[in-house]
């Protein structure tokens, strides 16, 4: 069993950096490991066009640690009013790589999202024409649908129809959480891929609910049964090029998580690759981690792979109880617990 693991530098194909005073902390945590990251656009107000994406990009670049080459890959936030012209202008910018479908009300800051999939068909047609990827938060939001069933319902009611209607559109089914989603992606064309988070590989709903409610495991899409967790582990460690790394690292201040009505999101960027390594090692599949973390994502996006590398060492360390987040603090996943892998510093 090797005590060192060297990988081509990975990228994060789904991350929330937030905005304002927190950026030096969130960008710094992402940049220590990742060469690039797909930046979620669900700010308030959201990132709806190329000009807003450029302004946000400049704020991220200004927050990078000294000497960092971390590259933010920007994303448009689709609304009912997103036009084909918005899509074409964003594609022409060179720095907007995708557009994100949030069903209205599905997750944090999604109130401006899409109320009916049909309303964005003109935008999707333009995206297919210019080669812009569609990123999907795949959950329905109707109150009568159980929260644990919302991903499967989205596949049945919407996603199947979208990929059939727009066969040349590249689609990323983000942060998949169910066996149903794995099977859908496996059966779909080569234009459909999926990201998988570290927390959905490492945990299931028992970890969140048995013995007390653990708010720092609460995320959307919510953790599912262990049979779904096993399906995700199978997919991530299979070597299938359709599955790749996307942390969905989503910081919320401690007081917003530890509350009567707590926010959804797990903060993992501080030790993302270490968490993935632990999940892959559980499956004796560390030899598959590099492809999942460093090859499949850029290949799907049509971007070059990174050329530098990172090294992990087998060394136990304790995750801090909290980390700075602007004027507040964030409780990271596994706070106060031990991780078995550690990133060698000074590699950015």
Swiss-Prot record:
| UniProt catalytic activity | (S)-dihydroorotate + H2O = N-carbamoyl-L-aspartate + H(+)
Which superkingdom does the taxonomy of this entry point to?
A: Bacteria
* Active site (record annotation): 248
Which residues are listed for Zn(2+) 1 binding in this entry? 14, 16, 100, 248
Q: Which residues carry this modification: N6-carboxylysine?
A: 100
Report the cofactor remark: Binds 2 Zn(2+) ions per subunit.
Name the pathway it acts in: Pyrimidine metabolism; UMP biosynthesis via de novo pathway; (S)-dihydroorotate from bicarbonate: step 3/3
Keywords on record: Hydrolase, Metal-binding, Pyrimidine biosynthesis, Zinc
Task: Quote the function comment for this protein.
Answer: Catalyzes the reversible cyclization of carbamoyl aspartate to dihydroorotate.
Write down the PANTHER family for this protein, in alphabetical order. Answer: DIHYDROOROTASE
The protein depicted here goes by the name Dihydroorotase
Upper taxonomic lineage: Bacteria, Pseudomonadati, Pseudomonadota, Gammaproteobacteria, Pseudomonadales
Record gene name: pyrC
């Amino acid at each position: 069993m090797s005590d060192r693991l060297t990988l081509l530098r990975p990228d994060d194909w789904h991350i929330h950096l937030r905005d304002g005073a927190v950026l030096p902390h969130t960008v710094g945590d992402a940049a220590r490991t990742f060469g690039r990251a797909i930046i979620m656009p669900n700010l308030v107000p959201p990132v709806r066009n190329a000009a807003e994406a450029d302004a946000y990009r400049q704020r991220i670049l200004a927050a990078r640690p000294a000497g960092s080459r971390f590259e933010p890959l920007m994303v448009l936030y689709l609304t009912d009013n997103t036009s084909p012209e918005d899509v074409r202008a964003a594609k022409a910018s060179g720095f907007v790589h995708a557009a994100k479908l949030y069903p209205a009300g599905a997750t944090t800051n999604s109130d401006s999202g899409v109320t009916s999939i049909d309303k964005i068909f003109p935008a999707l047609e333009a995206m297919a024409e210019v080669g812009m990827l569609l990123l999907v938060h795949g959950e329905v939001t109707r109150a009568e649908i159980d929260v644990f069933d919302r991903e499967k319902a989205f596949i049945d009611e919407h996603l199947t129809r979208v990929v059939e209607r727009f066969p040349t559109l590249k689609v990323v089914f983000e942060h998949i959480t169910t066996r149903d989603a794995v099977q859908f992606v496996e059966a779909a064309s080569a234009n459909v891929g999926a990201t998988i988070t570290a927390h959905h590989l490492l945990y299931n709903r028992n970890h969140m609910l048995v013995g007390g409610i653990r708010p720092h495991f609460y995320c959307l899409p919510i953790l599912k049964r262990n049979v779904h967790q096993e399906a995700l582990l199978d997919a991530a460690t299979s070597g299938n090029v359709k599955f790749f790394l996307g942390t969905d690292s989503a910081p919320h201040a401690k007081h917003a998580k530890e509350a009567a009505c707590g926010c959804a999101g797990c903060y993992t960027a501080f030790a993302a690759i270490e968490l993935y390594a632990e999940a892959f090692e559980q499956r004796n599949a560390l030899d598959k981690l590099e492809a999942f973390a460093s090859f499949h994502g850029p290949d799907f996006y049509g971007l070059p792979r990174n050329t530098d590398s990172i090294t992990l060492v087998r060394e136990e360390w304790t995750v801090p109880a909290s980390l700075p987040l602007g004027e507040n603090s964030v409780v990271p996943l596994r706070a106060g617990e031990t991780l078995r892998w550690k990133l060698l510093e000074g590699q950015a």
